[in-house]
Amino acid sequence: MRLVVQRVTDASVSVGGETVGEIGLGLMVLVGVTHEDTSEDAAYLAEKLVNLRIFEDEGEKMNLSLLDVGGSVLSVSQFTLYGDTKKGRRPNFTKAAKPDQALQLYEEWNSMLRAKGVTVETGRFGEMMDVKLTNSGPVTFIMDSKA
């Protein structure tokens, strides 16, 4: 699994002009799944994400986690995170998981975050979405479950 994590002051996702997910302080997370991913990958990244100290304390040091600040997650499925652009001019998406596998792991990952006490808003899997966010910092990380 691959995540693009952005620390935000607010974020929203809409489908066809309708807002389907919206958060205040927290993390906007694009979630990519490859065919080799399992529940263990989802569990590893869920645990890592909620405890990653990327929010600033009173001394302006990145010392607080999502759980520490009571932040939320806006989770958006993003198969293009596994796009390969090495050959030609059109990305190849063969490394991305098939939709049924990706949906199952994406939903499982969201459930794991909720089980840790995090409020999770989502986009709509497989839909064309518009994402708006205010990146705080800016602070952005790429996280992979496999090295």
Curated annotation (Swiss-Prot):
Alphabetic keyword roster: Cytoplasm, Hydrolase, RNA-binding, tRNA-binding
Catalytic activity, reaction form: glycyl-tRNA(Ala) + H2O = tRNA(Ala) + glycine + H(+); a D-aminoacyl-tRNA + H2O = a tRNA + a D-alpha-amino acid + H(+)
Annotated localization: Cytoplasm
Biological process terms in GO annotation: D-amino acid catabolic process
Enzyme Commission numbers on file: 3.1.1.96
Disulphide linkage map: none
Gene Ontology MF, one: Gly-tRNA(Ala) deacylase activity
Intervals of motif Gly-cisPro motif, important for rejection of L-amino acids: 137-138
Subunit structure: Homodimer.
Protein family: Belongs to the DTD family.
Domains as described in the record: A Gly-cisPro motif from one monomer fits into the active site of the other monomer to allow specific chiral rejection of L-amino acids.
Protein name: D-aminoacyl-tRNA deacylase
Record lineage: Bacteria, Bacillati, Bacillota, Bacilli, Bacillales
Gene: dtd
